[in-house]
């Protein structure tokens, strides 16, 4: 889970600690002073530390954290600019043009996706579902793509967004930052908690929606930026596994952090990072994240696919009508999963009859090996192969 899902738990822990201390502490008896106490020196404010590479400088006042908005030139390091994560409300004095350029560059999905979009390959006519944390549906980046929005296990009265929700939706279907801006998204919001029950309920709800849709117009795939089937990370993982089996039997392709399977095809996932000087080159991508070399052993797997997970600009909205964008120098696999499902949507636009097994196998067969031997998703080669071998 990303930062906001952890934030609530952290704040709760702090609150409980403070309450417990206040309610249970018994003041010790104090003898009357016989000598006037010495004056206490006023506390000296600790010097502001310069942000380190890959620190998050986003200004998010809505939730009472990350309150610093403006950084003077001596409060950041210009050499680290492309390593910082920040949003469009962060001000780095003296580097405004550079941060604006990073935000703009991060809008590009990379790997040649924009060349496909220029040809009209946008996922038009394809229906996709997302199971993730809540979002507000009025952000112009994604509002036109949301076909339905449902909540499971969430207090709807809060009317709050999260970091995760608009980010994954915009990576998949954003109008200016997304891989497949032509898709229709059925969004199932779940709490940012390590409990698979809401995920399982959401997946079954998607199956019910599909029962109402005509043949040829059903939801094809589900993007889940989590691992609800992992018993070590999630409670009630068996509930998810049961729902997943039902979905697969119904012909729904579900991609999670644990990958996907269909017929004899199997797909596992690895993080990768754009080469900022060759953003459209899959082979130039680095294995892992910018601040982490990743699992190099993954390159030996014949069914592991590297996905771009860093240096992305994504939609951001925490309260209604406060729509913006953030630049993530370091994302994570959560950002790679909707990217991959977006590429799938492009493929189904070109080859609507493509089976789930053919989808997974073609993604692997057309991937480009990088310098480490990890096979990186190659949207252009993927689409060209489908047009040649599967398109009607």
What are these language model-derived features?
Residues 52-65, 80, 123, 191-273, ...:
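Substrate-binding/access-modulating region of protease and related hydrolase catalytic domains
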Residues 71-72, 88, 111-153, 252-256:
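Acidic-leg catalytic submotif of subtilisin-like serine proteases
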Residues 88, 215-225, 238, 349-392:
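C-terminal subdomain of the subtilisin-like protease fold in secreted/lumenal serine endopeptidases
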Residues 100-128, 152-157, 286-290, 377-378:
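N-terminal domain-start motif of subtilase-like serine proteases
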Residues 126, 133, 146, 152-235:
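Subtilisin-like peptidase catalytic core
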């Amino acid at each position: 889970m990303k930062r906001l899902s952890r934030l609530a738990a952290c704040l709760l822990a702090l609150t409980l600690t403070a309450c417990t201390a206040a309610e249970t502490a018994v003041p010790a008896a104090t003898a009357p002073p016989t000598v006037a106490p010495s004056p206490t020196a006023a506390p000296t404010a600790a010097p502001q530390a310069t942000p380190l590479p890959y620190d998050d400088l986003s200004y998010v006042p809505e939730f009472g954290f990350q309150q610093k908005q403006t950084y003077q030139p001596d409060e950041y390091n210009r050499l680290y600019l492309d390593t910082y994560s920040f949003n469009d409300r962060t001000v780095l004095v003296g580097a405004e043009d550079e941060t604006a350029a990073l935000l703009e560059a991060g809008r590009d999905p990379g790997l040649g996706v924009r060349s496909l979009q220029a040809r009209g390959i946008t996922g038009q006519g394809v229906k996709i579902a997302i199971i993730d944390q809540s979002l507000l549906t009025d952000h112009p980046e994604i509002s036109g793509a949301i076909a339905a929005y449902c909540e499971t296990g969430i207090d709807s009265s809060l009317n709050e967004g999260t970091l995760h929700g608009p980010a994954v939706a915009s990576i998949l279907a954003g109008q200016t930052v997304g891989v497949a801006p032509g898709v229709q998204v059925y969004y199932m919001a779940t709490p940012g908690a390590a409990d698979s029950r809401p995920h399982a309920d959401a997946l079954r709800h998607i199956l019910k929606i599909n029962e109402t849709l005509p043949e040829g117009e059903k939801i094809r795939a589900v993007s889940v930026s989590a691992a609800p089937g992992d018993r070590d990370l999630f409670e009630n993982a068996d509930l998810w596994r049961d729902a997943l089996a039902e979905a697969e039997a119904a012909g729904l392709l579900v991609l999670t952090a644990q990958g996907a399977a269909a017929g004899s095809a199997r797909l596992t996932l690895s993080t990768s990072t754009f080469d900022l000087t060759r953003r459209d080159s899959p082979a130039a991508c680095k294995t892992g994240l910018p601040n982490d070399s990743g699992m190099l052993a993954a390159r030996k797997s014949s069914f592991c696919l590297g996905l771009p997970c860093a240096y992305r600009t994504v939609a951001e909205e925490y309260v209604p009508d406060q729509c913006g964008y953030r630049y993530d120098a370091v994302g994570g696999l959560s950002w790679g999963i909707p990217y991959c499902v977006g590429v799938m949507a492009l493929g189904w636009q070109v080859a609507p009859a493509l089976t789930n097994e053919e989808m997974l196998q073609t993604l692997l067969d057309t991937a480009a090996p990088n310098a480490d031997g990890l096979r990186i998703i190659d949207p252009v080669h993927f689409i060209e192969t489908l047009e040649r071998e599967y398109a009607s």
